[in-house]
């Protein structure tokens, strides 16, 4: 196999592997285009949450997780790439281009992360009574920082304020018929390869300090009697509030989440409070105005006595990877 053929195969495989990435409501709002010497990441407007995410914050964060997954997949195959973010100001859907590909030594750490992609999932159940080791928090924080964002661990008073803020955001969205219609749509799409099936949604609200999202309908996931006393809450944030920074926030989320998976720490992203402008501003005040909030994260150790929820469905590779330019 020629090096050109090896490269296009690696690019296609990296794009397919990126399909494991998490996304808001499992919308998977991305599409990849494989070129002879590059890989392009594009957003898909049809899978944007136009009611709850009109500016595309969470769309860009979601696509950023896929971008980071693809970067790791290439490194695991022995390829180094240069990332061009938002390379064409006249093409808003083109979010990133992986280019200037060079063969290099296979990265064992990236290979381990690719394995973590296949087991990573969102578990909305309360966490166990086992505390998260401080060393794990430090390692997760370093992974986020390496991608240009920050992870602020919240103290007890800040957690209570986040809880009130999340509750208020949920109330605001519950009173918005467009948001409720949108949520109903994405919780009834599992047979299409996107959305959230009943098996991953709580059958009743969890007894946690920071409330989870009200999905508008009960699911089939038992919550159990646990609480979140041993959970660690953190805020993913950065210096800017622009599309480039939202994309990088997704890359940082992916890096932190995969690191957490490797360390046996569960992660639940809580996005409702950043979807509502007023509550997003409240979160910013917790940062003393020194950054912009991207997501609230709950970190914890899952209860080993109960099996976790299944993985959410995924679109097929053919639906998200365009290889027509290299056939």
Language model regions located:
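Acidic, surface-exposed loops and disordered segments
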Residues: 1-327
């Amino acid at each position: 196999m020629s090096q050109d053929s090896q490269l296009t195969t690696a690019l296609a495989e990296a794009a397919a592997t990126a399909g494991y990435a998490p996304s808001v409501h499992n919308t998977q709002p991305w599409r990849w285009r494989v070129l002879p010497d590059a890989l392009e990441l594009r957003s898909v407007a049809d899978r944007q949450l136009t009611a709850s995410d009109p500016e595309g914050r969470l769309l860009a964060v979601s696509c950023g997780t896929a971008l980071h997954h693809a970067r790791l997949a290439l490194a695991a195959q022995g390829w180094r790439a240069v990332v061009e973010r938002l390379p064409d100001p006249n093409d808003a859907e083109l979010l990133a281009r992986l280019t200037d590909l060079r063969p290099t030594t296979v990265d064992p750490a990236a290979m381990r992360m690719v394995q973590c992609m296949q087991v990573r999932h969102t578990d909305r159940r309360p966490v166990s009574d086992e505390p998260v080791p401080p060393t794990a928090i430090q390692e997760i924080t370093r992974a986020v920082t390496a991608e240009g964002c920050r992870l602020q661990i919240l103290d007890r008073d800040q957690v209570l304020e986040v809880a009130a803020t999340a509750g208020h955001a949920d109330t605001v969205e519950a009173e918005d018929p467009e948001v409720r219609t949108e949520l109903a749509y994405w919780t009834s799409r599992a047979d299409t390869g996107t959305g959230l099936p009943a098996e991953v949604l709580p059958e009743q609200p969890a007894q946690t300090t920071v409330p989870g999202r009200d999905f508008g309908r009960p699911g089939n996931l038992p919550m159990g009697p646990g609480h979140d006393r041993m959970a660690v809450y953190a805020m993913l944030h950065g210096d800017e509030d622009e599309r480039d920074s939202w994309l990088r926030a997704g890359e940082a989320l992916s890096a932190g989440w995969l690191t957490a998976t490797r360390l046996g720490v569960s992660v639940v992203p809580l996005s409702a409070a950043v979807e509502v402008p007023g509550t997003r501003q409240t979160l910013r005040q917790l940062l003393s105005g020194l950054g912009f909030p991207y997501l609230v994260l709950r970190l914890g150790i899952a209860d080993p006595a109960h099996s976790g929820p299944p993985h959410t469905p995924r679109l097929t590779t053919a639906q998200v990877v365009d290889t027509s330019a290299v056939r």
